[in-house]
Amino acid sequence: MRIILAGTGSAVGKTTIATGIMKALSEEYNVQPFKVGPDYIDPTYHTLATGNTSRNLDSFFMKEGQVRDAFLKAMEKKDIAIIEGVRGLYEGIDSINDIGSTASIAKSLNAPVILIINSRSLVKSAAALVLGFKALDPEINIAGVILNKVKNNAHYLKTKKSIEEITDVEVIGGIIRDDSISIEQRHLGLVPAVERENSLSFIELWSNIIKESIDLDRLVEIAKEAPKLTSPREDIWNKLNKQKVKIGVAYDEVFNFYYKENIESLEANSCKVEYFSPLKDESLPDVDGLYIGGGYPELFSKELSQNTVLLKQIKQFHMENRPIFAECGGLMYLMNSIHEDKQVGVYPYNSILTDKVQALKYTIAEVKKDNIISKKGEKFNGHEFHYSKVLVDNSNIKHDLAFNILRGKGSYNNQDGFMEKNTLASYVHTHVAAMPNFGGNLAISAREVGG
């Protein structure tokens, strides 16, 4: 069983509704959550609601067969997939094709779509929206509608009647407007669930509202109508290494932006993954390589700077030529400082948080130098989203950069991937589907030095 919850646009309530549905259905089913697009934050709510790690599905990173492979791997021993879309149903990397859109995932998985509409001040115009979304692409099965932010029950019933009589699409529920149930936001989007002490109580509240407002039995019936997937699959990672190595992964309230498949690709390449906290731990685990993902080090820079023992150990790990791969927030952590707070100091540059977006885009990178995760001449898709920047220009740049950024911005002069010994740090986030040798290459790099 599978179903996609898509919006007519951003800010229609997809995450609140999807998470509430996931929580409500988890009382009876083993629910596997998914999120369309390059999002680390919404999935934290899905995971908390279901107890199962939410996965990302993205047609910019993944070929069609890889979308199905990632989906089917995650669905083993699960009952139903609830897939939260991104932005509007048809929004992708440009205004014409489907790449990067929720619609592309619906096609790859042959999944029915429930369209979520912000119904504030709409009645018959909501029917026009549904007609337009149906007509734009007949391959998309818009099987139902959820009306969010209706004024009252009378408003809901009028809008439901209009949609069902004009479009022949059923409305399976409506949620009365209540701004108190919205999720707290910050500069990169929602505040991750791992940082909110009251996240679970909010999810319980959303679930109760969903149970009162949406016909969940009908939603499950629609999900059951999805046909069996018979189209071919394509592996999202390659297995290159069989020798056992250990990789330390930074994971806490500061660093938690990881795609689960990236971690699994390490495990598939004989890596034992050991998690550690740069914020709280007093020593590194006994490992052969480090992976430091993104997050919010700019909000914890002072606390990170006070853990001087761990800062020194990571610097020493680097000096011993053992591999370290860092993305975005991890890149900032390896710099000399964040704001004026001292960090690891692998690189002599300073990083700061600005008041405007520095980069928000899907990226295409070409590898120009061999490094611990990729080889010269390869190309890979990724994404970048940050308000921070590294204070580097042609007057102080001292490092080779591994990647030419063909689409996107990068860290410096349309380049990214600071290289120093066996350490690589980049603003570009990678997904193993776009770099199938990621786990194997990092494992081999760790094996050659310390494994």
From Swiss-Prot:
Which terms does the UniProt entry file under GO BP? Answer: cobalamin biosynthetic process; methanogenesis
EC number from the UniProt entry: 6.3.5.11, 6.3.5.12
Q: Does the keyword ATP-binding apply?
A: yes
Hey, which pathway is this one from?
Cofactor biosynthesis; adenosylcobalamin biosynthesis; cob(II)yrinate a,c-diamide from sirohydrochlorin (anaerobic route): step 10/10
Active site (record annotation)? 328
Question: Which InterPro entries does the annotation name?
Answer: CbiA/CobB_synth (IPR004484), Class_I_gatase-like (IPR029062), CobQ/CobB/MinD/ParA_Nub-bd_dom (IPR002586), GATase_3 (IPR011698), P-loop_NTPase (IPR027417)
Q: Which domain of life is it from?
A: Archaea
| Residue ranges of every copy of the GATase cobBQ-type domain listed in the record | 246-437
Necessary cofactors: Mg(2+)
The feature of type site (Increases nucleophilicity of active site Cys) is located at 429
What molecular functions are annotated in GO for this chain? ATP binding; cobyrinic acid a,c-diamide synthase activity
Arranged from A to Z, the UniProt key words for this protein are: ATP-binding, Cobalamin biosynthesis, Glutamine amidotransferase, Ligase, Magnesium, Methanogenesis, Nucleotide-binding
Reaction(s) catalysed by this chain, per the record, are: cob(II)yrinate + 2 L-glutamine + 2 ATP + 2 H2O = cob(II)yrinate a,c diamide + 2 L-glutamate + 2 ADP + 2 phosphate + 2 H(+); Ni-sirohydrochlorin + 2 L-glutamine + 2 ATP + 2 H2O = Ni-sirohydrochlorin a,c-diamide + 2 L-glutamate + 2 ADP + 2 phosphate + 2 H(+)
Q: What does this protein do?
A: Catalyzes the ATP-dependent amidation of the two carboxylate groups at positions a and c of cobyrinate, using either L-glutamine or ammonia as the nitrogen source. Involved in the biosynthesis of the unique nickel-containing tetrapyrrole coenzyme F430, the prosthetic group of methyl-coenzyme M reductase (MCR), which plays a key role in methanogenesis and anaerobic methane oxidation. Catalyzes the ATP-dependent amidation of the two carboxylate groups at positions a and c of Ni-sirohydrochlorin, using L-glutamine or ammonia as the nitrogen source.
Record text about domains:
Comprises of two domains. The C-terminal domain contains the binding site for glutamine and catalyzes the hydrolysis of this substrate to glutamate and ammonia. The N-terminal domain is anticipated to bind ATP, and cobyrinate or Ni-sirohydrochlorin, and catalyzes the ultimate synthesis of the diamide product. The ammonia produced via the glutaminase domain is probably translocated to the adjacent domain via a molecular tunnel, where it reacts with an activated intermediate.
The family annotation for this protein states: Belongs to the CobB/CbiA family.
Give any extra note attached to this record: The a and c carboxylates of cobyrinate and Ni-sirohydrochlorin are activated for nucleophilic attack via formation of a phosphorylated intermediate by ATP. CbiA catalyzes first the amidation of the c-carboxylate, and then that of the a-carboxylate.
Descriptive protein name: Cobyrinate a,c-diamide synthase
Lineage start? Archaea, Methanobacteriati, Methanobacteriota, Methanomada group, Methanobacteria
- Record gene name: cbiA
